[in-house]
């Protein structure tokens, strides 16, 4: 898709949107569809992911998702996630936001709260301290939490992994995935100004339409598409 040549979009500062939820909720697909829709409207968009997103963070991603870091224990894993996030924020996310870009990120700080905090049984104060250091003031303007029964999401993830090796999180038991679903919903309930919950148990096109609608309503007024100078004076 291409931007309408009669539309110019300018953001005084960037807008940071994170995509959260359990395994198999379709986050990555929805992030791609939103990026395409916003780009077609003339916005500058960057898509990224965690763990990873920068050169340093991608190196850590392999260690974390392969299971190679499991022997270190959950506390050390949380530190590795935080180190990857810090590099990602400073090398990719913050510079893009400073240039007026809409940044879409597949997982961010809420995943650490859920995966390392709730189901990793780390004390909240430790998780919060790591988060504060890692994000260094870069907080999402909007977090979209894709909600799906854990059994459905896990089955989707396993089908997706049929032609690939499932990562260590996809191998975990249903009970663990159910706890994570509830934890994400708890985060949304505690921070309704930032978080929006979207029913992910629907066709992708229906979900994408809802996501685009809610994001367009949240974008700052100075970033709304306006007629170009040529159109305004015609």
Curated annotation (Swiss-Prot):
NCBIfam families (alphabetical): DTMP_kinase
Purpose: Phosphorylation of dTMP to form dTDP in both de novo and salvage pathways of dTTP synthesis.
Organism: Rhizobium meliloti (strain 1021) (Ensifer meliloti)
Source lineage: Bacteria, Pseudomonadati, Pseudomonadota, Alphaproteobacteria, Hyphomicrobiales
Keyword Nucleotide-binding set for record: yes
Gene Ontology CC annotation, any one: cytosol
Gene name per UniProt: tmk
Family membership: Belongs to the thymidylate kinase family.
Identification of the protein by name: Thymidylate kinase
Residues given in the record as ATP binding sites: 21-28
InterPro entries xrefs: P-loop_NTPase, Thymidylate_kin-like_dom, Thymidylate_kin_CS, Thymidylate_kinase
EC number annotated for this UniProt entry: 2.7.4.9
Annotated PANTHER family: THYMIDYLATE KINASE (PTHR10344), UMP-CMP KINASE 2, MITOCHONDRIAL (PTHR10344:SF4)
Keywords of this entry: ATP-binding, Kinase, Nucleotide biosynthesis, Nucleotide-binding, Transferase
Signal keyword on record: no
Any one GO molecular function term: dTMP kinase activity
Regions crossing the membrane: none
GO biological process, one term: dUDP biosynthetic process
């Amino acid at each position: 898709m291409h931007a309408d040549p009669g539309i110019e979009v300018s953001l005084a500062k960037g807008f940071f949107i994170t995509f959260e939820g359990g395994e198999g909720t379709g986050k990555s697909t929805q992030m791609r569809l939103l990026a395409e829709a916003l780009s077609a409207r003339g916005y500058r968009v960057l898509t990224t992911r965690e763990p990873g997103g920068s050169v340093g963070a991608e190196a850590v991603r392999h260690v974390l998702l392969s299971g190679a870091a499991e022997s270190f224990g959950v506390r050390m894993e949380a530190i590795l996630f935080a180190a990857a996030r810090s590099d990602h924020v400073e090398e990719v996310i913050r510079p893009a936001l400073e240039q007026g870009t809409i940044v879409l990120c597949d997982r961010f700080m809420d995943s650490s709260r859920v995966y390392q905090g709730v189901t990793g049984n780390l004390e909240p104060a430790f998780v919060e301290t790591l988060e504060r250091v890692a994000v260094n003031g870069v907080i999402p303007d909007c977090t979209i939490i894709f909600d799906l029964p854990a059994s459905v999401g896990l089955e989707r993830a396993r089908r997706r992994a049929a032609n690939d090796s499932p990562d260590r999180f996809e191998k975990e038991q249903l009970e663990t995935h159910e706890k994570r679903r509830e934890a994400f919903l708890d985060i949304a309930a505690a921070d309704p100004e930032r978080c929006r919950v979207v029913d992910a148990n629907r066709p992708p096109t229906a979900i994408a339409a809802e996501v685009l609608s809610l994001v367009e309503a949240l974008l700052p007024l100075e970033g709304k598409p306006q007629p170009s100078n040529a159109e305004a004076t015609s």
